[in-house]
Amino acid sequence: MSPEVTLNRISPALSPFISSVVRNGKVGLDSTNCLRITDLKSGCTSLTPGPSCDRFKLHIPYAGETLKWDIIFNASYPELPPDFIFGEDAEFLPDPSALHNLSEWNPSDPECLLLVVKELVQQYHQYQCSRLSESSRLMFEYQTLQEEPQYGLNMEIYAGKKNNWTGEFSARFLLKMPVDFSNIPIYLLKDSNEDPGEDVALLSVSFEDAEATQVFPKLFLSPRIEHALGGSSALHIPVFPSGSCLIDYVPQVCQLLTNKVQYVIQGYHKRREYIAAFLSHFGTGVVEYDAEGFTKLTLLLSWKDFCFLVHTVDLPLYFPRDQPTLTFQSVYHFTNSGQLYSQAQKNYPYSPRWDGNEMAKRAKAYFRSFVPQFQEAAFANGKL
């Protein structure tokens, strides 16, 4: 249900509270998922005019689950705080003394409902952490992470229901990876939603039993970061080793992701250096190049009155580790399909350790040695 539809059905006196929740409601680690409202109902009589819904179900993303809590206002007394019903979490009993925004409910503050929800989620987190005490292994995992502030302060835990036969229960740890994304080139972050939310990486680790015999990790990237790193298939995290623990595994994933980000940043600066060197070495021979992401370059060159194009198209995201392809194209000869005759070359002198100037010098020398055979092939296989 869209925010507009929701607000059109809510009692006007309660609308400011609900508007803050559905428009700005981001609670917990997963900033890509907002709070949602469903099951709008009214406790008013059928004679009450206009929109009168004053109770609803609030969907809250938490540790890879969706909590569904019922919130009940009284439209006849909109200045009073709401009641809460916690659905399947019947054993969750929040401490009222810790709910300051509920005990000091301020109906003139549109954010007061959202603030109460945030306080409740904090207590819910504490409740889930306390449930881990039933498993010494899971409690060890929690306590060792808690001792490291970069993990302990950015963690959500959900302990599943007990198996009636075995007495075992599963648990999921959701951690926000302490990785700096601020230096990723801006152009890589453009192709995304208007409001992409926070740039974040979340590691979910599910323990299917209390003894950690089955552990399944999964990495979630916010849309802009996933795009910047080359898509969902670009990053493969290692399996959780048998006998390992989270305090050893999580830093490995964090370092892997940090290295990936650094490759992207370094690749951008190396591509810029590469393009600058070609501009310097080939001057007026440069036809066009990508001045934003530095991913493409086209040269128009000649050898003994034979003119040809050289395209360095789509310099790899992880350049210089990945070698670019050079495509030679005759300006005179066509293939049977009407395309300019061309040959792609990747077998040329190259080292990722060279700087941009050395790469341009080596490419220039390679052009001189390769053009005669390319010209011969163009005359033999192309059409004028």
Curated annotation (Swiss-Prot):
Subcellular location, record wording: Cytoplasm; Nucleus
GO cellular component: BRCA1-A complex; BRISC complex; cytoplasm; nucleus
An MF annotation (GO) of this entry: polyubiquitin modification-dependent protein binding
Superkingdom: Eukaryota
Keyword field: Apoptosis, Cell cycle, Cell division, Chromatin regulator, Cytoplasm, DNA damage, DNA repair, Mitosis, Nucleus, Repeat, Ubl conjugation pathway
A Pfam family per the record: BRE
InterPro entries per UniProt: BRE
UniProt key word Metal-binding: no
CDD domains: BRE
Region (UEV-like 2): 275-365
GO terms, biological process: apoptotic process; cell division; chromatin organization; double-strand break repair; mitotic G2 DNA damage checkpoint signaling; positive regulation of DNA repair; response to ionizing radiation
Region of interest (UEV-like 1), residue spans: 30-147
Entry's family note: Belongs to the BABAM2 family.
Protein name: BRISC and BRCA1-A complex member 2
Lineage, uppermost ranks: Eukaryota, Metazoa, Chordata, Craniata, Vertebrata
